[in-house]
From Swiss-Prot:
This is Peroxisomal membrane protein 13. The gene is PEX13. It is found in: Peroxisome membrane. Disruption phenotype: Lethal, when homozygous. Residues 19-44, 56-67 have a biased composition (Polar residues). Keywords: Membrane, Peroxisome, Peroxisome biogenesis, Protein transport, Translocation, Transport. It comes from Arabidopsis thaliana (Mouse-ear cress). Residues 1-78, 258-304 are annotated as: Disordered. Interacts with PEX14; forming the PEX13-PEX14 docking complex. Interacts (via N-terminus) with PEX7, but not with PEX5. Interacts with APEM9 (via N-terminus).
Length: 304
């Protein structure tokens, strides 16, 4: 063991000389073997056999040679990176984004959504928006907006058209074979021009006669209200004239006597008949002499 200098600090553990009296985790491994280092660290008992260290690069190489190979990343592929197409179709012959290939387009497989090819895009099994190909948009089973055999409304519809021959073109499904009522981009066919013109003429005629009928009705109501108001004016005017005439006659001393009450005709049960328009009318009387021993002619002026 090294001598301790006077007045100095004690030696550090790694400055001490190695001994075999017990486990020492700080023994320098340069002069010992792996087994000695493990034994010195206290992780193995004295005399225990420790396996030799493992060569990790060789082990990784052996594992890779014996196990399943790692597939190539998308960016490691040869045709990756052309707009949108290489990533999904490079192994199938893809060369462009929405474009062609042997079996597909940008989204690959049978009946791709965008693009053409031998079986892609508008293919035998029909994509959505693709171009032509060996079994293209007017192909054997094509002709639809969203896929399937014979278009979206099914059947062999329009899809049986130009691909297999004009003889089967419109026979299996007619012009409605490729229409989808749920597709907002697939509008129904427009009606003929003469039918649109006829409907516009009918609409104009109906609007014209409707306006004329409305004006006639409004004018009729206005005339009815005018005549009702005029009759009420005459009636109220007659009543006003009667009141004024009575007042003037009273001022002149002319007394009116009530009209003799006529017995209204009675019905079979003793009840008066309806609609008696001339009952209880007043007639004019001549001037009367003053009552004897009475007041002047102004007495009972406002009386009856």
């Amino acid at each position: 063991m090294a001598s301790q200098p006077a007045g100095g600090s004690p030696p550090k553990p790694w400055e001490k000389e190695g001994n075999t009296s017990g486990p020492n985790p700080f023994r320098p491994p340069s002069n010992t073997s792996t087994a000695g280092s493990v034994e010195a660290s206290g992780t193995a008992n004295p005399g225990e056999v420790v396996p030799p260290p493992v060569n990790r690069p060789n082990t990784a190489a052996n594992m890779n040679s014996l196990s399943r190979p790692v597939p190539a990343r998308p960016w490691e592929q040869q045709n990756y990176g052309s707009t949108m197409g290489g990533g999904y179709g490079s192994n199938l012959g893809m060369t462009s984004g929405y474009g062609s290939g042997t079996y597909g387009s940008a989204l690959g497989g049978y009946g791709s959504s965008y693009g053409g090819g031998m079986y892609g895009g508008s293919s035998m099994y029909r994509g959505g928006y693709g171009g032509g190909g060996l079994y293209g948009s007017s192909g054997m089973y094509g002709g639809g907006a969203m896929g399937g055999y014979g278009g979206t409304m099914g059947g062999y519809g329009m899809g049986m058209g130009t691909g297999m021959g004009m003889g089967m073109g419109m026979g299996m499904g007619g012009p409605y074979g490729s229409q989808d009522p749920n597709d907002p981009f697939n509008q129904p066919p427009s009606p003929p021009g003469f039918w649109i013109s006829f409907l516009r003429v009918m609409q104009g005629a109906v609007n014209f006669f409707g306006r004329v009928a409305m004006l006639i009705d409004q004018n009729t109501q206005a005339f009815h209200m005018f005549m009702s108001a005029l009759l009420q004016l005459f009636d109220r005017g007659g009543m006003l004239y009667g009141e004024l005439a009575r007042f003037v006659l009273r001022m002149l001393g002319v007394r009116t006597r009530p009209r003799k009450m006529q017995q209204p005709p009675q019905g079979p049960n003793g009840l008066p008949l309806p609609h008696q328009p001339h009952g209880n009318q007043n007639y004019l009387e001549g001037p009367k002499t003053a009552a004897p021993g009475g007041g002047g002619g102004w007495d009972n002026v406002w009386g009856n």
